[in-house]
Regions:
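Short glycine/proline-centered loop/turn elements that form peptide/ligand docking sites
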Residues: 127, 150-153, 170-175
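A short beta-loop-alpha structural element at the N-terminal edge
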Residues: 25-37
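Short, Lys/Arg-enriched N-terminal segments with co-localized hydrophobic residues
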Residues: 2-13
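Conserved GNAT acetyl-CoA-binding A-motif
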Residues: 127, 134-145
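Acetyl-CoA-dependent GNAT
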Residues: 20, 58-116, 127-128, 187
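Hydrophobic adenine-recognition pocket in adenosine-nucleotide-binding enzymes
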Residues: 30, 113, 146
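Helix-loop element at the rim of GNAT/NAT acetyltransferase active sites that forms part
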Residues: 40-57
Length: 188
């Protein structure tokens, strides 16, 4: 699970790791060419868990929407992809509201990991790199929200210094049931 080496990709670094299962993991900035693979990944993850803001019904974006989003990246708004065997198996985005003077110091983090990549270090490495890039990009605070019964994710976030800052009541509505989410945050 050690960092093998880094390769500069424009101003971003592509990082490579060996995971607990012996596979090589590459983490890098998402590129336009990833649009279709990202949608496949996101829809797969949505079928595997009810902890995301979308589920088996699918993600409501198409390839062109995803390309447009990728083209809009800035140091405060970006998405990292985690790739194993040329397949995107996880993603992590940070988005700041740069158009709002009083909010542009703060980003919102979202992470999506396919089931086959659970428990092997992918989420940890994505979080490390995303928080590093958020700080480099000028953010001073990162927030996220997580379903209150997603204990594994909450544990990961707490390991990274996130603290519970509040609760969003009835945040998710899944199969006729409302679920609350915690708001968690940390300084970077």
């Amino acid at each position: 699970m050690d960092l093998i080496y880094t390769v500069y990709l424009e101003e971003w670094i592509m990082k490579e790791y060996i995971l607990k299962n012996g596979k090589k993991l590459v983490i890098r900035l998402a590129e336009e060419k990833d649009a279709e693979g990202l949608l496949v990944h996101i829809n797969q993850a949505g079928r595997e868990t009810d902890f995301l803001g979308f589920g088996k019904e699918g993600y409501d974006k198409d390839i062109e929407d995803e390309k447009k989003y990728i083209k809009s990246f800035t140091p405060k708004n970006f998405m990292l992809v985690a790739v194993i065997d040329d397949e995107i198996i996880a993603s992590c985005s940070i988005g700041a509201r740069e158009e709002r003077i009083r909010l542009k110091h703060m980003g919102n983090l979202g992470i999506c990991v396919q089931k086959k990549a659970w428990g092997i270090g992918v989420g940890k490495y994505l979080m490390e790199y995303a928080l590093e890039k958020a700080k480099e990009g000028g953010l001073t605070k990162v927030n996220l929200d997580v379903r209150i019964d997603n204990e594994k994710a909450i544990h990961l976030y707490e390991k990274f210094g996130f603290e519970k800052e509040g609760t969003i009541k009835k945040c998710l509505f899944i199969d006729g049931v409302y679920y609350d989410n915690y708001i968690m945050g940390r300084e970077v």
